[in-house]
Structures are given as structure tokens and as C-alpha cells.
Amino acid sequence: MSLSEFYLKYSDIRIRIAPFRTKTDFETRKTVAIIDELINRADTVNAGAYAGGRFGGAVGHTVENLMGRAEKYTSALEAGEYPLKGMFTEPGLSLIDHSFVEKDGLMHVFYNRGFIGFEWDTRYVDTIGHAVSADLVNWDIQMPCLTAERGGPDDYQTWSPGVVYRDGVYYMYYTGVNIHVAQTICLATSTDLYHWEKYQGNPVVLPGEWGEWHADRWSDCRDSMVFVDDDGTAYMYYCTARHKPDGGMETALGVASSRDMFTWKDEGAYAFDICDITLESPYVMKHNGKYYLFYTNCGHGTAYAVSDDPICGWQSLGMLIEKTGEPPMCPANVPSCAEVFCYKGQWYISSAERQPGCEQYLEIFHFTWHEDGTASVGARLE
């Protein structure tokens, strides 16, 4: 696209979305804000800004992709449609890893606040957002509840919140990332879900001897979630890497256990045959006496497994939400970050499929358990 062609298209889209700027409904405001982010990022890339991040490639951060998506959304608005209906995010942002917790009949979701058109290492993911809903469709956005902090293990970025309630306290386990991208599991607590205090003893979990962790280089220890079993034992699951018997490293699920939510015992790390690239965003729950693990199988989508033991013995049940259509432009562009939960008597599963150009939204689908212990995904809530 030549410079003159670009600015003709840029001006055309801005003129066409102008009438929608006076609309006050959330769907229109969200879509217009997304269009603005797409065309403005395309403008900087077209002017010569480096589209990649600190670690290289930036799949989808091309003028053609960014402008193409903006054109699609603009045309939909003109046709009286909401192109992002059923896909929640704060206007102008991406919603990535997330965690649900119910309180007083309302559902709270906590999430990474990402940036459209920018990789995480270009415009930092350094705040955790918060929204509340009574129906899982209409969300009331709250103030961000946690941020990166100078001098701590999260002095660069904060990722992947996982919230769990126990004995009057809400525990948020999140990934603290330092400037070298050495990742650690950190903790913040709250009694009301709005005011959070970081634990002074952070970090609370690092990989065991089966892996490696170095403060001065990239080290995998992220995407934690905590499940409290019937006997009161809390189990933490997180994305990491372990030594292979024949040398080198492989992606793995790290597990730790605790009785007090602060002190954690290493329970090892486990690999999965079905996961051929990277395992991310684990989520564990108990159903009918069995333990179910849902996780992102990068390059493919959301997979799940079952076990009689909360630590090991996981047996694959296959893919649950697969990437459809064209193959993903990069392994991260798949349905991911799933959580399964029951709300007001109905089961649901969440997903946040990353689009080329770092668009990412929260989607919630109906979810059904079957008598044989398997599950299936139904229609999306809109």
C-alpha cells in the first residue's frame, strides 16, 4: 500500500466512524475504540515504526492486516451490526489471561490489560483489570486493581491473575515479571475484591530442581491458578519448563501444594504428549470425584485431561476448543486461557482467542458435562 493509498483509506475510515462516536451504548463505544487503535497503530507502522517487539517477530502487525480488520469492523457498524458482540474487553484494549470469582451473586473477572497492535514486550502488560457482571454478558468495568511495582519481582510486568477464596480472604496469584523476563508466582490478598495488598514475602513459588530459574534471563514460571481440594489442601498449577532425561528442556506443568496459601511445597513438573509446543494457562477443578485439567495447547487450542490424583496421572481427553479456519499465524493465535465454572446453576467455559495484531477478547460459552466424564462446548453468550 502506497503512502497516498494508506492515507486515503485512513481518512475514509475516520470519516465513516465519526457518526458512531456520539453513540453511548457499550458495543458501539468498544468497537469504535478498537477501530481507532487499529488504524492509529497502522499509521505508525506505515510511517516506519518497528512493528516487532523486544524479542523479534510481531505476527499480524502489518498495515494490511490492521487496516483490513478496521475496515471489516467499520463496514459492520454501517450495516447495523455489532462485529464484536459476545467478545468483552475494555474499549481500546485487549483482554488476555483472566480469572473468575463469584461474590454475592455477582461474577467478578480479573484480567491482563493488553494493547492492540503491540506485542507484550513493546507496550507493557503491567496492570490487572477488573469487571463485574450479573449475567456474564454485560460487564461493569472497575478501576485496575494491581500494577507492576519498582523494586519487586514484578517490576516489569504483571500477568495472568488467578483468584481463589478461602476463609474470608481472596487470594490472587499472579505472574511477576522482571526486566529480564524472569517469571515468578506472586501473591496479593483482598477481603472485598476491590482493594488488594501485595504479600511482602513475594515471590511465593519458583521452579524446583527439575527446572531452571535465573533472575538475569528469561525463566518460565507463569500462568498460575490455585484449586482447594475437599480436604483443605491447596494445589497450584503453573506453566514452566523441566529438564529432559536426554538433555535440554521441555514445556511442563508445575505443581505445588499448601495448607496456608502462603507456604508452598514443590510437587514436581509434568509433561503432556498431546502438547507439542507449549502448555499455558492451566485450570484445574474437581467434578464427580475426578480432577480435570484444562490448558492451552499452543498452536492448536484448548485441551483437557482427567486424573484420579490432583498432582499427576493426567490422561488426555483430547482437544476441547480447537482453532478453526486457517492455521494460526503463530502458536499463540488459538483459543486459550480457558476457565470452567458454574454460575446461577449453569456451566460455562471461557476463552480468549488471540487474533493477529494482538486483538484478544473474553468469550464465554455454554458447557456440558457428559455421563462418560467428557465434556462439550456449546453456543457463545451474546
Task: Name each region found by the language model.
Residues 61-382:
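Carbohydrate-active catalytic/glycan-binding domains of CAZyme proteins
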Residues 2-56, 60, 69:
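Amphipathic, heptad-repeat alpha-helical segments
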